[in-house]
C-alpha cells in the first residue's frame, strides 16, 4: 500500500494454519510477504486485544497460545522493517471514518470487532464483542461466523438488524460503519447514519497507521 491506502500489488491470502498459535502463524505470515518488495513499514491488524506491541487476547485464534506474545517485535525482527501492531477493527476504522463526532466501526466476520473514534481520534481497547447480548451469548456468539453457519443467513441478518438500534442506544454514535467479510451479506435498509464499507478497508487502514498527518496517526497503543 502507499501512504494513501492505495493497493500497489494484488491482495495476497493464505489459509489460517490448523494450529493457530504463533509457532505456526508467524512463519506463515513471513512466507506470505516474501514476494513483496520495496516496502518500508509493516502494519498488523490483529483480531483481539493488543497493547504495546503484544497480544493479550485472541478469542478466535487461541488466547492460551497468544497471551503475552510480542508479535510486533517478532515480526519486526524477522522482516527487518519497523512494525506496528493494532486491533484489526481499529485499523479498518482508520480507513473509513470521516473524523467528525463519535464514529463506531463494527466488523462482522469470524467474530464481532469494534472500534470507537471521537473527532478522528481512536479510543482504543474497546471490546464490545464480549458483552452479553442474548441470554448467555455475547456479540461474538450471537452474530459471529460460527453462529451464522448454524442458523443460516436469514436468521443471522435478523440478528444484525436487531443489534443496530441497541448499539445506537448504548453508544450514541453519530455514524456507524459496518465492515468485515460478512457485511456484504446485509441486504436490508439501513438507517441514514449507518454505512456498509468494503472489507478491503481493513488493509487500506494499515497505511494510516503510519500516516504522518492528522489525528489518524496510530502507534502501538
Per-segment meaning from a language model:
Residues 101-104, 108-133:
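Anionic-ligand binding region
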Residues 46, 108-110, 180-181:
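Short secondary-structure boundary segments
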Residues 167-199:
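Glycine-rich phosphate-binding loops at beta-strand->alpha-helix junctions
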Residues 103-107, 147-151, 213-221:
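A polyampholytic, Gly/Pro-enriched intrinsically disordered region
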Residues 1-24, 121-150:
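Short glycine-rich, Thr/Ser-proximal phosphate-binding strand/loop in the N-terminal lobe
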Residues 10-43, 49-102, 141-142, 191-212:
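Glycine-rich phosphate-binding loop and adjoining helix at the ATP-binding site
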Residues 156-169:
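A short, acidic, amphipathic alpha-helical segment used as a generic capping/interface helix at domain edges
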Residues 1-2, 48, 94, 112-117:
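Short beta-strand scaffold segments in enzyme catalytic cores
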